[in-house]
A protein has these predicted regions:
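Intrinsic-disorder/low-complexity linker and hinge segments
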Residues: 129-141
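Short acidic, Gly/Pro-enriched loop/turn segments at secondary-structure junctions
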Residues: 102-106, 121-131, 156-165, 388-392, ...
Length: 516
């Protein structure tokens, strides 16, 4: 070929290439004007298909240089099968980046997504349509988000019962990465806990998203909660740490964990104790309750086993809004001194011995101290019980000696041994009924009350003795008492004598209502 021809051919080729490049550049630079409406429509349709609902958006801007990029504000998504329910999610602002190849793939791949002000409202399936329920497997996703950052997210799981409080999770930091379509996303999250205040670190897997019933979306993970200040709950204090793992669905999560509080204190008792617990719980989104099954707690030489639930109620009627704790607790072989340290300031505690008890526990919501709101109803048995107050012990020893016909004074071993009774705690007042204990020569039965804060004692009852009144003294008094022996003797007993216990915890008074 002639050199001039080659030269003209090269010029034309370069010119054509330049023209094509110019056209492509013009198309890219002006893509926003003709591709944006198509892209907007495609994005909204993909969201509708993936999450099965209606999408509203206040603004959406898309650019294509140097790569596809979208920003939007005011996104609201409403599930079709949740008439009357809050939007499935609302979003204040978002930014998304994608590659050209990612957009051409099916499902479309979004390489990075930042979400600001995300609120998710997961309603359980009460209002799910028959068609949705019959669909079975959720539809395949139209979009895959490879990396998501959604700091400041709030997740709210709505119970079926509108009178119950929803479960709320305020997620301070949240990042997710996806390995591919129809596979769980891995997440790292920090949740800001309100009470007790602190940050919960969690990581695990989330999804795939269940568009038919979002509450059935799977979630697994581990958590760590450190240095939580319990003093925000009036009446108790200490620094709590907890760790554990969880699995299930958004609507029903199983949690297994443990807590450690080395400096736990109840204000009315004023004693520091090391409190450890292990627990298994179900966070039930269908009713907003947390089921505890069981909780094992240990402090000192005492182990407590409890099970129950934490329920929440909205404001309205005569109730107080908030969470109520309901527990069924028992101790099989505990140290009575450990129990008393919870509510009595003295050291040593008023009694030593081994205790067995069972109690119903209720802590309603409210602004008062926990010891004032705490409600107990149960029964107890104490084996080998012995009072530590020398004055009280001496008085009981004197009564024991008299009831055995020993008129020369008390012996050294006349201590109380076995106790049992029923107790009710309400408004800081411990009421005992059917309270009885044995001392050598007699059985004491009492009913009365003890104020946790006032420390006032007010008990009345009887002492049933093995010997008659006349045998508890000597001389002329003994002869005179023989005339009234039949009055005080009942059902074959020696005598039934009225008794009272009063005063305060630090200075108790005890005595018979007749003078021998």
């Amino acid at each position: 070929m002639h050199p001039d021809v080659k030269k003209r051919t090269l010029v034309w080729a370069l010119a054509a290439a330049a023209l094509v490049a110019a056209i492509c550049a013009a198309l890219v630079l002006t893509a926003g004007s003709w591709l944006s409406p198509i892209a907007k429509r495609e994005i909204l349709e993909a969201l509708k298909r993936q999450y099965r609902g209606d999408v509203e958006i206040r603004s959406l801007d898309i650019t294509f240089t140097p790569h596809p990029h979208a920003t939007g504000e005011g996104l609201v998504f409403r599930a079709k099968d949740r008439a009357g329910a809050p939007p499935l999610f609302t979003l204040r602002r978002f930014e998304a980046d994608a590659g050209w190849m990612g957009l051409l793939l099916s499902p479309h791949r979004i390489s990075f997504l930042r979400l600001d002000g995300l609120e998710i409202h997961v309603a359980r399936g009460a209002q799910q349509s028959p068609q949705a329920g019959a669909a079975g497997k959720p539809p395949a996703p139209s979009l895959v988000f490879e990396e998501v950052v959604a700091d400041g997210t709030r997740l709210e799981i709505l119970p079926l019962d509108a009178s119950k409080l929803p479960l709320q999770f305020d997620i301070y930091k949240l990042s997710l990465t996806s390995p591919g379509a129809e596979r769980p996303m891995h997440y790292r999250a920090q949740l800001r806990n309100a009470k007790p205040p602190g940050i919960i670190d969690a990581n695990g897997d989330f999804g795939p998203w269940n568009a038919l019933d979002p509450g059935q979306t799977g979630v697994t993970g581990k958590y760590l909660f450190s240095n939580a200040d319990l003093s925000v709950f009036k009446g108790i204090s200490g620094r709590l740490s907890s760790q554990g793992e969880f699995h299930g669905q958004l609507g029903k999560i199983e949690v297994n964990g443990e807590t450690d509080t080395p400096d736990f204190e109840v204000s009315v008792g004023g004693h520091l104790m090391h409190l450890r617990t292990t627990f298994s719980a179900t966070v039930d989104g269908t009713n907003g309750d947390t089921l505890l099954h069981p909780v094992n707690a240990q402090f000192g030489h005492t182990k407590v086993v409890a099970q129950g639930k934490i329920i929440g109620a909205q404001s309205g009627g005569h109730g107080v809004p908030g969470k109520t704790i309901l527990l069924d607790a028992s101790v099989q072989d505990g140290d009575v001194a450990d129990i008393l340290r919870m509510g009595v300031k003295s050291e040593p505690p008023p009694m030593n011995g081994r205790i067995r008890f069972h109690a119903k526990i209720r802590i309603p919501p409210g602004a008062g101290d926990i010891p004032d709101r705490l409600e107990l109803n149960g029964q107890f048995e104490i084996a080998g019980g012995r009072f530590t107050n020398a004055k009280l012990e001496h008085t009981l020893s004197t009564i024991s000696a008299r009831t055995q016909g020993q008129t020369d004074g008390p012996t050294d071993n006349a201590a109380a041994s076995d106790f049992q009774g029923n107790f009710v705690l309400r408004n800081g007042l411990m009421t005992l009924s059917g309270f009885s204990f044995h001392i050598p020569g007699a059985t004491v039965r009492l009913d009365g009350a003890y104020g946790l804060k006032t420390e006032q004692l007010n008990f009345r009852g009887t002492v049933t003795t093995e010997v008659r009144l006349s045998q508890m003294t000597t001389g002329l008094k003994s002869k005179l008492l023989r005339m009234v022996d039949p009055i005080f003797s009942r059902h074959g007993t020696g005598a039934v004598i009225p008794i009272h216990i009063g005063g305060t915890r630090s200075s108790p008074t005890i005595g018979l209502d007749i003078k021998l």
